[in-house]
A protein has these predicted regions:
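Alpha/beta-hydrolase superfamily serine-hydrolase fold, recognizing
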Residues: 1-197
Length: 197
């Protein structure tokens, strides 16, 4: 799904675009051959964060439901206070994280008033979310926030799969697609999707 991108269009533009597109699909999907009873959302990195935020927004607005979320090393914690968020790790260093969040949040960056639909890790109530798949590598700046989010989902009663890949940095499944760890990640994703669909 296409949505307006930051920094030209900061929060909530992209999220509202995604919600509108998903709502259209739920209401009209059968006209284009989509089984509207089995729709999930997902994405990698900022797209994974957008998917997590979209799942919260869908739950909170209550107009329709989604069946699962697939969060691939999602960017979900704007506070950037975890240990891994401050490591100088390959691919996504602290400066990259600062740039990503400041671009997305605009004037809300480093504010105490960042909405949970902008930064899902801020949400205290994770009940009522759909079954969730989360993956991250141990060398990913988002590893700590993703692991913590998965644990919180699990404690909230959300069926949650967490996959952590040793030695894998952010985006490993793309730039190192032929490695054993990337093949394992694809296998884990496919198995989850097989169970959801």
């Amino acid at each position: 799904m296409q949505y307006r991108l930051a920094p030209e269009h900061p929060y909530p533009s992209g999220l509202e675009d995604s919600y509108s597109g998903l709502k259209w699909l739920k209401e009209n999907g059968e006209t284009v051959g989509v089984d509207t009873g089995r729709i999930g959302i997902g994405g990698p990195s900022a797209g994974g964060g957008m998917a997590a935020a979209l799942a919260l927004l869908v739950r909170d607005r209550g107009e329709f439901e989604i069946d699962y979320q697939l969060l691939i090393y999602p960017m979900i914690d704007d506070t950037r206070t975890t240990i891994t968020a401050n490591w100088d790790v390959p691919v996504w260093a602290p400066e990259s994280n600062d740039f990503g969040w400041s671009s997305y949040l605009g004037e809300l960056f480093e504010s105490d008033d960042v909405p949970v639909h902008a930064a899902p890790a801020r949400e205290s109530n994770l009940e009522g979310l759909p079954p969730t798949f989360i993956m991250a590598g141990t060398l990913d700046a988002f590893a700590d926030e993703d692991i913590a989010y998965a644990q919180r989902l699990n404690h909230a009663g959300v069926p949650t799969e967490l996959h952590v890949y040793p030695g894998a940095p952010h985006g490993f499944d793309g730039f190192a697609a032929s490695t054993a760890v990337a093949r394992q990640a694809r296998s884990d994703i496919n198995a989850f999707l097989g169970r959801m669909l």
